Amino acid sequence: MMSGRRLWITLAAVLGGIILILLIAIPFLLNADNYRPRIQTMLSDATGRQVTLGHLSFSLFSGSLTADQLSISDDPAFSQQPFVQAQQIHIGIEVKPLIFDKEVKIQSITIDTPKISLIQNQANVWNYASLGNASKRSNKPETQSSMPNLSIGVLEVKDGQVTITDLGAPTPPRVIQNVQAKISDFSLTTPFTYSLSAAFPGNGTVSVSGKGGPFNQADASKTPFTAKIEVKHADLVGGGFVPPSAGVAGIADLNADVTSNGQTAHVQGTIDATQLKLAVNGSPAPRPVHVNFTMDQNLASLTGQLQNTTLAYGKALFNIAGTYQTQGAKTTLNATASTQGAPINDLEDFLPALGIQMPSGSKLQGGTLTTNLAITGATDAPVISGPVRLNNTTLAGFDLASKMGPAAALVGAKPGTGTVVQILSLNLREAGGGIQAQNILLTVAGLGTATGNGTVSPAKALNFHVVAKLQGGVASAATSAISMIGGTAGGLVGGALKNGIPVTITGTASSPIITPDMKGLTGGGTGPLNAGSLLGKKGLPSQIPTKGLGNSLGGLLGKH
């Protein structure tokens, strides 16, 4: 006879074999495809969209149903193409209710490599806003009562692709790759947690995590949420954030915290931008720009307000405040940017990023900048205006005499190593790439002042008209020389001291041409005068102190 121990071993083996056979046979005995209509209806009613699944198969070991196709229809007001489509979807279920009660209880959903289409219309409404809309669900009583209680333990998207289309913008759709998303404890009636990551063109990445819900079943875009956003190495142009024509470029990192009640969103964070360029003809800044910002946005009207926002470049700090409004692809600003006593040494190498050029071989050294600029209009073509004031700075390395041409012979101007500017103030207006400068006041240490107006064209052509006046010791030296000059030359110098010398500045910012207006000095005469016509072929008598006079006038005319 068989011993008791051996009997139990034999029975266990037999039972194990039977169980194994059943486990293997169940997927064949259970036609999972029979559950496809029921699951499609459940998901369609949950989303408010038509959900279509391909052939369903069942895996007992993974406890999941696998469909070889998935399609979720879009809101017909936006597109007839699918909102979501994927080659495969895994639906985790509770095995026992499925086998014994023929009941489907969904525990998880995993969508592999889906293509998701996000569309925004001209009224700033998104195609996902109608997701979960109760008015679009099935009218069956049993479905209506069960849908609010639908919950999914885990909803995942793996290796997705999201295409973002703005119907109000002329720009092509933006495509975001490698989208990974996970929602835990998803329910239409209770809060849930989520995380998301994706890649931008140009090696940029974004990760978002937070909490959402309860789900707004009338408008999904108004579902309350919190979010922690981290963006790394976002290429502003290559990533499609700004069009190339805007002239803005750079690489940005962003960290932000968002809190939304479904009506308004409060955002607080930082931006660090490298290689930043803010003008079409600008060049990348060599150092990073750091921004601290706080903003509140109305999600319905897409209006917002900037508060407690600062922009720092080195030790230079700008305060930014104002409002904005987005309509379609256009965002309009009404903001100010101000600074008080910002060190010019920290701003000098940022000027090329703004498209501002210094004369070739020169640079600003020392001093401070004070300004309060208004920034209005569309973000891709803003109008910037307001007062600008520089104090106690030096334009080093600018050879003035070489720019003065024939006038240098008259005033005796000689090359200088720099121009010490006590004050430079003006009212600036920049629009369309061109600059208007009004009410210019320039005070050069020990030389004099210059006042006037001018413009810089989008091609950087200069057209300035100023009046230069001697003052202090320079004026005294010139006055003593007048007594030794007779005739036309003496009258010219006397007029220059009394009324100022009209000066025209043309050329370009990198190569300006500075020309005293001799015709203006003589009251219109028969034509422009030059050094030869004023002084004769032999010039001034040898006893006239031309060196002192020339240096005095030349310094004022050139160094401004």
Label the predicted regions.
Residues 514-560:
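Gram-negative outer-membrane assembly/targeting C-terminal domains
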Residues 89:
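An amphipathic, basic-hydrophobic helix/alpha-beta surface used to engage anionic
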Residues 41, 59, 63-85, 105-129, ...:
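Small-residue helix/turn framework positions
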Residues 49-54, 421:
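A short, amphipathic edge element
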Residues 1-48:
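N-terminal type II signal-anchor transmembrane helix
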Residues 133-148, 524-525:
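Intrinsic-disorder/low-complexity linker and hinge segments
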